[in-house]
Amino acid sequence: MSEFSTVSCGGYPTVSDTFGAALWSIDYAMQMSVVGYSAAYLHTRERNVSYNLFDYLGDGVDGWITRPIYYSYFPILQGLQSYNGSRVVDLGLNDNSTAGYGIYDRETSELYRMILINFKDGNGPVDFVIPATGSPRAGGGKNATVKFLTATSIHEGSDISWSGKTWKGVLDGMPVVSGRDADLTQMDISASYTLKIPSPGLAVVMFEKPLPSGEPSGGGNSTNSPAGSNGSGNTTTTNNGSALSAGAPMIVALGAVFVGALVLN
């Protein structure tokens, strides 16, 4: 695709320069991957345009600020990079505030990444239930690493964290420790696992060792994750008729969707 962004001809203040725009950009890019686009240009323009990736301050201040949409590049890169090529499947979550994508190895058809998006604004985390069974997973399906993209609000313009790092208050382009939502490493997913994604926020779930280019400079902090738990709630349906659960706090179960998604490959 030649170009895309939030609002044509430069964006719109309070829309294009928010964390919500970053999540939207990721969701849109993944939708393009689902239907077969191989590349796209996330548009940016001259200084002080609302949907820019970053801006030179000028006016006597020597430095650059990083805008929210720049953060969208990292989950997309981390999710789609592969050795053999990728096949992306929309998991069909039947909810306006969540989205999920399974990313499969084009040669082996193993599920090796997921991107899970929570668009809710500050109402507590959403629980995404990762089942013990379903499509074959890369790395044997026993462990996973999770990287988070989060912000304090869907309207936030600077206090954003990716993989435990942020560009908030940074003028030299080098990220610093954000102090929140660090990576989860070596998650035991041999049993059903409940992944809590902050509101708003996004998680990239990796079932095998990530390639190095998805890291901000300096890498992210890591912690060991607690054991997962089963979720329960009221039953709704996905777009392909598979069951998922939703409750309060909201729970999204992904098990049956994986089986259906693998057939599409």
Task: Describe these PLM feature segments.
Residues 133-199, 222:
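Acidic, Ser/Thr/Pro-rich beta/coil linker or hinge segments at domain junctions
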Residues 111-112, 117-121, 179, 188-210:
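Extracellular low-complexity, Gly/Ser/Thr-rich intrinsically disordered linkers
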Residues 48, 84, 96, 143, ...:
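N-linked glycosylation sites
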Residues 240-265:
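Cleavable C-terminal sorting propeptides in eukaryotic secreted/cell-surface proteins
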Residues 2-5, 42-46, 116-120, 149-151, ...:
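Active-site-proximal beta-strand/loop segments in catalytic clefts of secreted hydrolases
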Residues 93-139, 146-153, 200-203:
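Carbohydrate-binding surface patches
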Residues 6-101, 108-110:
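Aromatic/acidic polysaccharide-binding cleft in carbohydrate-active enzymes
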Residues 206-240:
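C-terminal low-complexity, Ser/Thr- and acidic/Pro-rich disordered "stalk" regions positioned immediately N-terminal
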